[in-house]
Every structure is written in C-alpha cells, then in structure tokens.
Amino acid sequence: FNRFSKEFMKKAGFSEFTAPAELNESELKILGLETAELTVYGYRPVMISAQCIMKTRGKCTKNSSFTHMKDRIGEEFLVQNRCDECYNIVYNSAPLYLGTQKVKIQKLSPKRLRVRFGAERKEEVKKVLEQAIDAFGEKPQFDYTQEHFKRGVL
C-alpha cells in the first residue's frame, strides 16, 4: 500500500481507509492519515494456515473456536479455527499496542483510532479501553509489540 494505492482508492470512490500495518511511522507520515483509521491495539494475524490444527490433532469438533499453539522456543500463539472453510488464523503472541507513541500518533493525525478485540477476556477489554481512553496513558501492564511502527518491514 502506498500513495498510488491511496489515490486509486480515492478515484474509485473510497473516502477512508485503514492504515497499513506494514508501514512504519515515517512511511505513514508520507502516506498521510487524514482520512485513515490507525489500529493502536489488537492481535495481528501472522499466518493463515490451510491445514486445520484441530483436524490434524484428530480433535475437530466442526465448531469455530480459539485455541493456542507453542513454537519451538515456547512462545504461545492464539489460533482461530475457521471451521466453515477449514483453515486457521494464527495471531502474533503479543498484541500491537501504540499507546506509548501518543505524541507521534498525534503528529500523524489519523481521522480515527481503532482498538481491535478478538479473544480477550472481559477484564482485558476493560483494561485496554481504560488505557486508550486515558489518551494512551502509562506503559500498559501487559506484554505488547509495536510491530512495524518504529522499524518498518525492511
């Protein structure tokens, strides 16, 4: 996604877009976020698997649900089973959280901010929302990542 994509979408009649997760802060600044929504919290997909984890384990219930899997170093990843089409979405082990980047986000001036929830428990949702409403308060009391916002893809 780049300024040419943004211009194409504008000509096609789209008035708003969600800022691409792959771009870092300086790339987002060049792109311009005046008509964009910027995701500031949420577990991001890292992989879509065409093989169902539950089916492979012989535990398929044909009901979409969430489960977890660990990688070789013991990091736990949230996995959403999509039984309607027999595939899985594997999410990053830590959620994106840009609350500690308040000043930089204000300078980017996105039209709106998105807080995206998936499998969080009620208490977690409340905690994250309180921090977001508190204008990106202090460092959160949970593990998080800032993904590409600071370092970019390359």
Give residue spans per PLM region.
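Active-site pocket-lining/capping segments in soluble small-molecule metabolic enzymes
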Residues: F1-L154
